């Protein structure tokens, strides 16, 4: 999950949507005509800094999208979620042009993004895609499959990768197949992609997973089980020897339905629970305009940086140096 749309199911979005991410945060505001995405990954920030002397700067996720460039393709309630699918016009002057976004829950959590003509997204899904070179050969689990953004990137960039994805809501998988090309991806990768509907925390595979990617949110917050050390011990036991877990742990930009569940507090509780299991072998990558906007966590011994970079596509190498030991 990496965005939040702050509007109730009854709210009509007439003029604007604003977002910040980890979750990006979208809010409807009257008498405005822009959609803004104030969050950007640091790789993108660094590129923009290098262009700061230019008088004609390219559009960034900070810039708005005219509302006429956004179309609602689907909107309905399932047993588990309030589901919306948005499409951003290819004519929009914005980095998200040509994308489709999956929003879930009353706060409007955006769980997936997909572009028609490119693989990478300039979101944390790209960071997830840096894990294959630092894990043993073997299957990767995606816990919180959404519409398949993570799986799509992994399958496109790593021809030998096998992905097993778990999603609780069958309606989300139906939407993924209809609006996010999941049916086509499944047909083309019958021996490489396996999608299951059910509780992701029960995920298991004989022989274990080489890597586990965790992206589990409900009602706008990391699920409570992730604040329990027992959950991480169970996931650790699901790994092959040398395997790793990478987690979207959210941050201050997460807006939960329950206002008591502050995103930054929940993130720290999750990291502390992980620390109880993984000890010093826990690293954090901070994203966003502010240091605590959103974060990812990585377990295991820290890889040798240059070796890791050299095994990645050039467009992903910039993320490697952003990891820091967790010191909470």
Predicted regions and their residues:
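The AdoMet/dcAdoMet-binding core of the Class I SAM-like
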Residues: 2-5, 39-46, 53-56, 113-278, ...
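SAM/dcSAM-binding transferase cores
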Residues: 2-97, 101, 109-115, 130-133, ...
């Amino acid at each position: 999950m990496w965005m939040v749309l702050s509007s109730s199911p009854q709210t009509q979005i007439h003029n604007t949507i604003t977002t910040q991410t980890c979750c990006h945060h979208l809010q409807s505001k009257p008498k405005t005509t822009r959609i803004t995405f104030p969050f950007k990954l640091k790789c993108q920030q660094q590129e923009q800094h290098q262009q700061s002397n230019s008088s004609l700067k390219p559009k960034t996720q900070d810039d708005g999208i005219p509302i006429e460039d956004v179309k609602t393709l689907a909107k309905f309630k399932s047993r588990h979620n309030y589901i919306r699918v948005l499409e951003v016009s290819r004519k929009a002057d914005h980095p998200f042009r040509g994308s489709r976004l999956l929003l879930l829950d009353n706060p409007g959590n955006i769980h997936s993004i997909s572009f028609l003509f490119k693989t990478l997204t300039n979101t944390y899904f790209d960071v997830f895609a840096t894990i294959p070179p630092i894990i043993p050969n073997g299957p990767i689990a995606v816990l919180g499959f959404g519409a398949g953004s993570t799986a799509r990137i992994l399958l496109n960039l790593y021809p030998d990768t096998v992905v097993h994805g778990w999603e609780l809501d069958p309606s989300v998988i139906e939407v993924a197949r209809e609006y996010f090309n999941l049916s086509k991806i499944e047909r083309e990768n019958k021996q490489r992609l396996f999608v299951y509907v059910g509780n992701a925390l029960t995920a298991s595979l004989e022989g274990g997973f080489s890597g586990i990617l965790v992206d589990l949110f409900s009602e706008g917050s990391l699920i409570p089980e992730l604040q329990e050390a027992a959950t991480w011990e169970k996931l650790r036991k699901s790994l092959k020897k040398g395997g790793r877990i990478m987690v979207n742990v959210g941050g201050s930009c997460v807006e939960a339905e329950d206002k008591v569940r502050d995103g930054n507090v929940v993130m720290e509780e999750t990291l502390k629970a992980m620390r109880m299991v993984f000890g010093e072998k826990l690293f954090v990558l901070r994203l966003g305009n502010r240091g605590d906007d959103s974060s990812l966590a990585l377990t295991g011994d820290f890889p040798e940086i240059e070796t890791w970079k050299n095994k990645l596509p050039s467009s992903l190498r910039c993320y490697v140096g952003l990891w820091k030991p967790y010191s909470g």
